[in-house]
């Protein structure tokens, strides 16, 4: 390149060109791409007056106008990308110019839209004001209870008849389309309304469409003339029926979350009951358990009414000495039958408190835990159990491996944020094994914690409900713990939960037996059905292959009718769940969670259905490290198998599209769309199986907390603590950071009116951002530090509010990116025999996507882009 340029060009130009070539190479361009980039540059300078100010402005805005083209690393077909993007920008600019004279009509339309949203936002309050007089008049008050029940029965009967007609009435394609348009219009009309009315309306619309779909599937879509099609169709129908049942039960469960608030305790502390705090442990590290004990010691409760117990099923001397040192009780069993349940039951023989609070050994309670929960027990004498959320301050494998910690609600947020709150409405709150308080008298009546299944917590709450006792749930986080560190540990935990819930279904089925209300039976049933999702999910991931590979008609109907029934069913369910679950589970993420678990929970749940006594308890490991980024090939093997199977389906689909019967073309396209969606979801599952590095043993917790640091010379600086861990803190000094790395300073933190001092060393200074490492602390200082940080009453309460509202289309785009990321990981980590397939596939997709035009960046480019493009057109 250098010799050729020197021969053809004058020295200054040759030197500049050689410089450009070397710059391209330094940024990773191949020799051919770098040489071609230089050639395109020469041609551009010959054809276009790039030195003109107008072109200079375009070049200055390159990053904004052409965000997908790296000018420092050219590719052979970059001219085509520039051409496509330029045409796109010109089109945007021209369209805007054409419509500029009509800006007033658009402004009017925007004003109408704003008025509509304002009207919808204020509708519930206006309806309430206009119907207040009806509540006061009590127009039906003169009627007897029997008459009112009769009127209600008539209304319900007519509603059911109308619903039955809507569900079963057959329509031709045009009528079905019009019917769906009407329902969709109503859904769009009410979905922005605040309050519960809009959610109830969306549930009604979704149930109408979904019930109509299931009716159509059972009555019109099975091919009874072809055995293969019939068998495959029935298998898919089984999975769809399961999904429909879970959908209906799920709507019922969360239709009216209770959102229970704390009840104040009596002012006279002598009326407060005695409480035992149990911290069971088996093989966890002492450092994991210490913070829980330190926080328990600081709980705001009379010390003569509080007893803390370490229940050590590992029988370790270090734990015994630690308990003696900090002044808590210690119990170790000689035998270890029934795992955690047996450990707690053994401790119940020694503890004599009126209530027992149970924490897993990594769950750190806040100081307000008992004051927030115990008031309800004094108010309601039949209340047997109060559950609070399981909140985690470390990322679970999904959050860590996908980089979504505190960006997307995690897997457990839906259960603890919405489902348990919905259960509370129906008096069906489950005991979750930790972060809960149980009244001793009812617990003793049922013989202690249930030991017949491996999910002793849910089984215990079921027994309490059968005895006529009530339960409660408070959604305010009052403790926080460690999430599982690896995907394999996470899956192992879910396998235990799934096996245990199915064991309860078989051994103590909530649908039968005495003591439960109908609503409680349905809530328990839905919880157990949730863990049977493995087989249906695998069916959905392979169903389109029945047609593409076996030519079996799993839905025996024209492709147009399939679209008119399937798409509305999915869209309405997605829209309704987005409205109800928006803060707790973003759209399409359930697909990822279920796909990751499906293969692994299917066999144990099937075994538990057949033989409920088979299986054993496994302890979930906490507090581990992941020292290197790697793919868990053992865990990801099933996903890769399903990916290859679906790729085979794509190949078969392409063949059928070109060489199959013409009347099947639309069916082939629908099947391929389904397969591509499955491939995206499976790609997401693969992305989760790539374990990211976790080298911090002490997890950082983000917070905004006032504090101060004191230098040895007496100077004091106010600061804000923005993160902390068990080993150090990150602070921002309010003003100039007048500290040096290696300098020893004292950190001052407040708890209530009390101020505490902790010795630290400066390990990092970046502007006014300072990293502090805790120096060795005394036991008293360590207790104080935990109570000033992890155990603060307000530490966890605002975490849930930090999640953005769900936007289904944005969530779908996130899932698409996630799926592509999974295949990139396969191309990076796969064995040579497989790597070439996925590397070629991801490279092809990335190459195709690189030609798609992008919108210019908003802040930097959209405003000037119109002017620049106009200049370019001149």
Swiss-Prot record:
Gene name for this UniProt entry: bcsA
Main location: membrane
Cystine connections: none
Superkingdom of source: Bacteria
Protein's name in the database: Cellulose synthase catalytic subunit [UDP-forming]
Pfam families: Glycos_transf_2, PilZ
Organism placement in taxonomy: Bacteria, Pseudomonadati, Pseudomonadota, Gammaproteobacteria, Enterobacterales
Localisation: Cell inner membrane
Enzyme nomenclature, EC number: 2.4.1.12
Region spans: Catalytic subdomain B: 441-501
Entry note about domains: There are two conserved domains in the globular part of the protein: the N-terminal domain (domain A) contains the conserved DXD motif and is possibly involved in catalysis and substrate binding. The C-terminal domain (domain B) contains the QXXRW motif and is present only in processive glycosyl transferases. It could be involved in the processivity function of the enzyme, possibly required for holding the growing glycan chain in the active site.
GO molecular function term, any single one: cellulose synthase (UDP-forming) activity
Gene3D superfamilies assigned to the protein according to its UniProt record, in alphabetical order: predicted glycosyltransferase like domains, Spore Coat Polysaccharide Biosynthesis Protein SpsA, Chain A
Keyword Cell inner membrane: yes
Example of a GO cellular component annotation carried by this entry: plasma membrane
InterPro entries: Cell_synth_A, Glyco_trans_2-like, Glycosyltr_2/OpgH_subfam, Nucleotide-diphossugar_trans, PilZ_domain
GO biological process, one term: cellulose biosynthetic process
Domain PilZ positions: 694-790
Record-annotated active site: 313, 457
Region (Catalytic subdomain A), start-end ranges: 271-364
Membrane topology: Multi-pass membrane protein
Reactions accelerated catalytically: [(1->4)-beta-D-glucosyl](n) + UDP-alpha-D-glucose = [(1->4)-beta-D-glucosyl](n+1) + UDP + H(+)
Role summary: Catalytic subunit of cellulose synthase. It polymerizes uridine 5'-diphosphate glucose to cellulose, which is produced as an extracellular component for mechanical and chemical protection at the onset of the stationary phase, when the cells exhibit multicellular behavior (rdar morphotype). Coexpression of cellulose and thin aggregative fimbriae leads to a hydrophobic network with tightly packed cells embedded in a highly inert matrix.
């Amino acid at each position: 390149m250098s010799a050729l340029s020197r021969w053809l060009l004058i020295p200054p130009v040759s030197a500049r060109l050689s410089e450009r070539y070397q710059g391209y190479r330094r940024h990773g361009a191949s020799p051919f791409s770098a040489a071609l980039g230089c050639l395109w540059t020469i041609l551009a300078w010959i054809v276009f007056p790039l030195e003109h100010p107008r072109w200079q402005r375009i070049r200055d805005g390159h990053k904004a106008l052409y965000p997908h083209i790296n000018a420092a690393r050219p590719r052979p077909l970059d001219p085509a990308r520039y051409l496509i993007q330029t045409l796109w920008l010109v089109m945007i600019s021209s369209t805007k110019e054409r419509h500029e004279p009509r800006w007033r009509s658009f402004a009017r339309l925007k004003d109408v839209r704003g008025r509509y949203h304002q009207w919808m936002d204020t509708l519930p309050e206006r309806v309430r004001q206009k119907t207040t007089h009806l509540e006061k008049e009590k127009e039906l008050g003169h009627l007897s209870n029997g008459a009112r029940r009769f009127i209600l029965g008539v209304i319900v009967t007519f509603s059911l008849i109308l619903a039955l007609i809507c569900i079963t009435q057959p329509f031709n394609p045009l009528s079905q389309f019009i019917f769906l348009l009407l329902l969709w219009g109503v859904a769009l009309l009410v979905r922005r309304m605040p309050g519960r009315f809009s959610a109830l309306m969306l549930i009604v619309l979704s149930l109408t469409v979904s019930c109509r779909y299931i009716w159509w599937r059972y009555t019109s879509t099975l091919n009874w003339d072809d055995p293969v099609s019939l068998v495959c169709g029935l298998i898919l129908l089984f999975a769809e029926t399961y999904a429909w049942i879970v959908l209906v039960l799920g709507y019922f469960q969360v239709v009216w979350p209770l959102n229970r608030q704390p009840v104040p305790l009596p002012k006279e502390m002598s009326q407060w009951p005695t409480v035992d705090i149990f911290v069971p442990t088996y093989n966890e590290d002492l450092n994991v358990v210490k913070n829980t004990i330190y926080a328990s010691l600081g709980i705001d409760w009379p010390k003569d009414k509080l007893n803390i117990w370490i229940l050590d099923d590992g029988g370790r001397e270090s734990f015994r000495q630690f308990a003696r040192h900090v002044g808590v009780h210690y119990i170790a069993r000689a035998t270890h039958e029934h795992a955690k349940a047996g450990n707690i039951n053994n401790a119940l023989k020694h503890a004599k408190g009126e209530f027992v609070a149970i924490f897993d050994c990594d769950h750190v309670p806040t100081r307000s835990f008992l004051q927030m929960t115990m008031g309800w027990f004094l108010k309601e004498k039949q209340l047997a159990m109060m559950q609070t959320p399981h909140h985690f301050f470390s990322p679970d494998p999904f959050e860590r491996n996908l980089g979504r910690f505190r960006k997307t609600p995690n897997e457990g947020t839906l259960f603890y944020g919405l489902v348990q709150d919905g259960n509370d409405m129906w008096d069906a709150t489950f005991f979750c094994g930790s972060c809960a308080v149980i009244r001793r008298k009812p617990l003793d009546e049922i013989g202690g914690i249930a030991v017949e299944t491996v999910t002793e917590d849910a089984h215990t709450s079921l027994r309490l409900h059968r005895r006529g006792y009530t339960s409660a749930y408070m959604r305010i986080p009052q403790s926080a713990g460690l999430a599982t560190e690896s995907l394999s540990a996470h899956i192992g935990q879910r396998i235990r939960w799934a096996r245990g819930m199915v064991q309860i279904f078989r051994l103590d089925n909530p649908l039968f037996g005495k003591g439960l209300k109908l609503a409680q039976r349905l809530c328990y049933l839905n919880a157990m059905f949730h863990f049977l999702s493995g087989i249906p999910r695998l069916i959905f991931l392979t169903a389109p292959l029945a047609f593409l590979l076996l030519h079996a008609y799993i839905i025996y109907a024209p492709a147009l009718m399939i679209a008119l029934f399937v798409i509305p069913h999915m869209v309405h369910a997605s829209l309704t769940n987005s409205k109800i679950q928006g803060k707790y589970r973003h759209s399409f993420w359930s697909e990822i969670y279920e796909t990751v678990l499906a293969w692994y929970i299917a066999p144990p749940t099937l075994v538990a259905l057949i033989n409920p006594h088979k299986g054993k308890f496994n302890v979930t490991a906490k507090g581990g490290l992941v020292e290197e980024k790697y793919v868990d090939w053992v865990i990801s093997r099933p996903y890769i198998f399903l990916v290859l199977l679906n790729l085979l389906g794509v190949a078969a689909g392409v063949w059928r599209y070109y060489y199959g019967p013409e009347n099947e073309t639309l069916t082939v396209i629908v099947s391929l769309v389904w397969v591509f969606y499955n491939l995206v979801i499976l790609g997401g599952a693969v992305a989760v199986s790539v374990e990211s590095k976790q080298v911090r043993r002490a997890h950082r917790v983000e917070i905004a907390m006032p504090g101060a640091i004191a230098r040895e010379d007496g100077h004091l600086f106010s600061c804000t603590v923005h993160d902390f861990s068990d080993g150090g803190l990150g602070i921002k000094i309010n003003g100039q950071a007048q500290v040096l790395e290696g300098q020893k300073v004292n950190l001052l933190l407040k708890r209530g009116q009390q101020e505490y001092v902790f010795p630290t060393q400066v390990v990092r200074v970046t502007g006014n951002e300072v990293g502090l490492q805790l120096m060795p602390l005394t036991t008293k200082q360590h207790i104080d530090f935990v109570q000033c940080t992890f155990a603060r009453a307000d530490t966890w309460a605002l975490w849930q509010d930090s999640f953005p509202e769900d936007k289904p289309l944005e969530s779908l785009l996130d899932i698409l990116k996630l799926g592509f990321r999974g295949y990139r990981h396969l191309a990076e980590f796969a064995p040579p025999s497989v790597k070439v397939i996925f590397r070629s596939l991801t490279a092809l997709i990335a190459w195709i996507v690189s030609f798609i035009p992008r919108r210019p960046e908003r802040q930097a480019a959209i405003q000037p882009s119109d002017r620049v493009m106009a200049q370019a057109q001149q």
